[in-house]
Regions:
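A shared catalytic/ligand-binding motif for oxyanion handling
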Residues: 1-117
Length: 117
């Protein structure tokens, strides 16, 4: 079981997509959790489907130029049910061949108190 979580700071550029494709190929994750996609839902899903054809995924749009969340999983290795929540995307997961279930929350919050530091 491999779960990869990344703050990608945008999915729009071709160079970023190719870089992510290399990372995903080298690590072979079963579940990918991306934060700060900085995209509305459709472009994020389109970019991810190019990187990982055949995967299933769920996305939440960004709020302007910040935020955006995408969760993806390989249906050959894991069965997931995705729920959009106020806090992010909740995945109820079970890896194939296992009876153990796993709940994963993919969330991203803005840094609200940066002036304090």
């Amino acid at each position: 079981m491999k779960i990869l979580s990344l703050n990608v700071r945008g999915l729009g550029g071709l160079a970023k997509q190719k870089s992510l494709q290399r990372i995903f190929a080298s690590l072979s994750p079963d579940i990918i959790l991306l934060q700060e996609t900085m995209n509305s839902t459709y472009p994020a899903l389109l970019a991810f489907s190019k990187i990982h054809p055949g995967w299933e995924f769920c996305a939440l749009s960004s709020n302007g130029l910040s935020g955006g969340i995408l969760s993806g999983w390989n249906p050959l290795h894991v069965k997931c049910k995705a729920f959009r929540t106020f806090a992010g995307i909740l995945l109820k997961s079970r890896f194939r061949g296992s009876t153990t279930s796993l709940s994963i929350l993919n969330c991203c919050g803005p840094y609200l108190h940066r002036e304090s530091f």
